[in-house]
């Protein structure tokens, strides 16, 4: 998996899917319906990510976390954390063996947006997208 930074304010879903699929950000954005618009305006839902990963041959499923807390989350899972002061629109991160891949580690700075690894999840997981074996 490559470390990929998001290129738009709401592009964390694209960056996480790109990292998981080992594709570039721009290449992955083409698989999203209205990707160039949604990355600037509304963001993406879990089903959007699942559909894109299925298109590139990675079978996944998404499910919600009913209670607060971060149960055992498998490696190569994309997690959505709910709205919080740091991420007012919520945020997607990818779990790897190196820690959590955060496609906008230096939020709120935008020039440039930097991706990086962090040891802990910044907030509680609300949704998980994981690979089906």
Per-region residue spans from a language model:
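Active-site nucleophile-adjacent alpha helix/oxyanion-hole segment immediately C-terminal to the catalytic cysteine
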Residues: 1-41, 46-51, 55-58, 133
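Conserved active-site-adjacent core of cysteine acyl-enzyme catalytic domains
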Residues: 32-124, 130
């Amino acid at each position: 998996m490559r470390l990929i930074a998001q290129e738009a304010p709401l592009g964390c879903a694209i960056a996480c899917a790109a990292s998981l699929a080992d594709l570039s950000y721009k290449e992955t954005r083409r698989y999203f319906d209205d990707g160039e618009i949604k990355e600037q305006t509304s963001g993406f839902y879990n089903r959007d990510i699942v559909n894109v990963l299925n298109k590139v041959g990675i079978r996944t499923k998404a499910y919600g976390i009913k209670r607060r807390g971060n149960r055992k989350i498998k490696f190569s899972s994309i997690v959505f954390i709910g709205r919080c002061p740091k991420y007012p629109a919520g945020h997607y991160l990818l779990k790897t063996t190196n820690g959590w891949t955060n496609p906008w580690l230096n939020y709120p700075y935008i020039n440039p947006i930097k991706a990086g690894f962090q040891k802990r999840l910044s907030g509680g997981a609300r949704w998980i997208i994981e690979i089906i074996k």
